[in-house]
């Protein structure tokens, strides 16, 4: 039987759900490991201009989905979740800049809550997270260093940088772009 359960939380303008399955992908069968992945989407009405659902199939959503999944797996002992697959869905209700970093932060919280509940129910022997994860966007706007860029600042930034860090401030992921001279 396929165990399917969802935990939901809303962080500011993002809805994060965690779905659990008692199956792992075929390539992980007989490996003594579970799996953890993520999917990211912006709802059609989340920005000033409606976003077509067809655009969600494009590269940006997939790239952000992979970023979220990699960030979570970087601090997860997949051996502890052996036999389970977890899918974290990050849906943006209102886009205001910083959606990927907010989604990473919310995804870690939702998944940590899920793991804690499963430990309390004796479905996991311990929480598989080895440490906390946090993400932040930073940039240079008008020559000034700015943290947590909103849409207006992000669209005018000379440098836009997303950092994913663990609780020891070790860098797990870095993404950056520059307009003109960085």
Named regions from a protein language model:
Residues 15-52, 62-63, 67:
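Active-site cofactor/substrate anionic-group-binding motifs, chiefly glycine-
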Residues 17, 24, 65-74, 82, ...:
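Conserved alpha/beta core surface patches that mediate binding of polyanionic ligands
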Residues 66, 87-118:
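Conserved mixed alpha/beta catalytic, RNA-binding, or beta-rich assembly cores of soluble enzyme
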Residues 80, 98-102, 112, 116, ...:
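A structural signal for small-residue-enriched, beta-sheet-centric alpha/beta enzyme cores
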């Amino acid at each position: 039987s396929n165990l399917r359960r969802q935990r939901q939380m809303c962080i500011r303008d993002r809805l994060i759900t965690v779905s659990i399955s008692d199956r792992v992908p075929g390539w992980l069968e007989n490996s003594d490991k579970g799996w953890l992945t993520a999917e990211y989407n912006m709802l059609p009405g989340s920005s000033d201009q409606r976003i077509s659902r067809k655009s969600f199939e494009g590269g940006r959503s997939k790239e952000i989905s992979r970023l979220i999944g990699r960030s979570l797996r970087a601090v997860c002992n997949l051996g502890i979740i052996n036999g389970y697959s977890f899918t974290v869905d990050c849906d943006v209700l209102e886009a205001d800049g910083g959606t990927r970093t907010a989604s990473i932060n919310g995804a870690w919280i939702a998944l940590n809550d899920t793991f804690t509940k499963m430990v309390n129910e004796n479905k996991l022997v311990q929480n598989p997270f080895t440490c906390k994860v946090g993400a932040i966007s930073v940039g240079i706007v008008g020559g000034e260093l700015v943290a947590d860029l909103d849409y207006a600042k992000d669209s005018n930034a000379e440098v836009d940088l997303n950092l994913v860090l663990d609780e020891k401030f070790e860098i797990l992921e870095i993404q950056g772009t520059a307009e003109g001279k960085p």
